[in-house]
């Protein structure tokens, strides 16, 4: 493919109904169930074509693990089964990644 200057490329994209916009983003965070991908100072492009908007994110990112979600019912169960206070039960569940059996085993050692 022949190299094309940016102005020609933009004109051609516009003729095809594709619009591209650079966004001045400071940070982008993508959250999954167990981690966050944090992009600081990314290059973000918004591409609109045929009524669909697509975002392109380019840059370095950091992966941060999210703490497990621990329900009050889980805490109460651990408190009853291991005969411990709420703080101890919560800490055991956090250390066990929310795994009830592992938290109980650690407390019963």
From Swiss-Prot:
The segment(s) forming the NAC-A/B domain are: 3-70
TM annotation in the entry: none
Please name the Pfam families in this protein's record: NAC, UBA_HYPK
Primary role? Contacts the emerging nascent chain on the ribosome.
Protein name, UniProt field: Nascent polypeptide-associated complex protein
Which PROSITE patterns does the record cross-reference, listed alphabetically? NAC_AB
SMART domains in UniProt = NAC (SM01407)
Zinc-finger in keyword set: no
Q: Which gene encodes it?
A: nac
Cystine pairs annotated here are: none
Q: Which family does it belong to?
A: Belongs to the NAC-alpha family.
């Amino acid at each position: 493919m022949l190299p094309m200057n940016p102005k020609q490329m933009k004109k051609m994209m516009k003729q095809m109904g594709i619009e591209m916009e650079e966004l001045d983003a400071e940070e982008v965070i993508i959250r999954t169930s167990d981690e966050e991908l944090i992009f600081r100072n990314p290059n973000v492009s918004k591409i609109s074509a045929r009524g669909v908007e697509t975002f392109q994110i380019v840059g370095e990112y950091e992966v941060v693990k999210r703490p497990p979600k621990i329900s009050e019912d889980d805490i109460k169960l651990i408190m009853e089964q291991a005969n411990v206070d709420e703080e101890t039960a919560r800490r055991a569940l956090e250390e066990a990644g929310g795994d009830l059996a592992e938290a109980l085993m650690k407390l019963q050692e």
